[in-house]
Structure formats: C-alpha cells, structure tokens
Amino acid sequence: EAVGMSSQSDIRAGYLPLLIGTKYNHNLDENINVPAGLTPIPGAMALGATWNTNLALSMGEIAGAELSELGVNLYVGPSLDVADSRSGAGSGGAGLGAFGGNPYWVGEMIRSFIVGVHRGSSGRIAFVGDSFPGLGSADSGSGIDAPVINKPLEELVESDLNPYRIVTKSSYGSEERIDVLMP
C-alpha cells in the first residue's frame, strides 16, 4: 500500500489515483527558479554541508506541504548522487545538485528530506529518486553522451549505491515508512 495515496481496497477495485508529478526541487536544483509564493530552500550541496538531518527534515516538510497544496502527489528528486571530486562540475558529475561527497551523509540527508516531504504532505506524496547510481561520478552528462562511470564495481557498490540502500530501508525511526520508486 502506498502511504496516503489510496487504500488496499481501492487498489483491488482497480482504482489508482492520477499521478501528478514534478521534478521541481524548490531551490535544490539551481537551474530552476522558485515560482512566486513558494518558499526558497537552500540548494542540495548547501543543505548537505550542514550535516543536519533535522534541517533536511524541516526543508522536506516545507516542500511536501507546498507541493501537496498544488496537487502534486509524485515528487521526482532530489538527486541521490554522491558528488565525486574526480569528476568536475562541468563533466557530468553531480556537482552542486548532490547533497555531498560522503555516501553515508548523502543517504541520511536525503532520507530525512523524504520523511519531511511525507510529513509535510500528510503522506500524500510518493518519491522517485532523480538519478541513477553512479551518475555523480560519470564522465559526461546523460544529455550530452552516454555517461561512463570509471569505477570498479566494488567502489560503485560501496559509495554510489549507499544512499539508495539508506533511502529504501523499510522505516525511519519507528513510525515512518518511505515509499521510493527506483528508475
């Protein structure tokens, strides 16, 4: 059962809600202007630099409440990428769109942000991660050419997949459940 989206009986009866999604990340994506009336939120790297999961939770609550008011029930983003210092911002790496370069803290910050989105929307918003494991260290952006991730599998599993593992855990604390759709 998706949290707050519909009941099990509705799904069995063939009813699924229309998903209205957005990739709009408030100010988490520096390439998107914040529409009038919505609260500007620090960029992902700035928020991640605080290492403050309570702040990420609060920012998620703001995003969840405002997007829910607009009728959005599918949140695409923020990026689950881990910034890699070996790939510059111009190459295709995550750059400022990532919460940081430490896989553990990236996962914890994103997880807190998602819990905040769920709380702020009263469980009415599902989440889809805005990336694919390893793109934070790719040699080119996916819009330019097929990205190549020059890492051994072991390193990819240790670093880039860690935020996905953290976010897809079954619960946060004892009362929250996180719904995540993987690309």
What are these regions (language model features)?
Residues 1-183:
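Glycoside hydrolase catalytic-domain context in secreted enzymes
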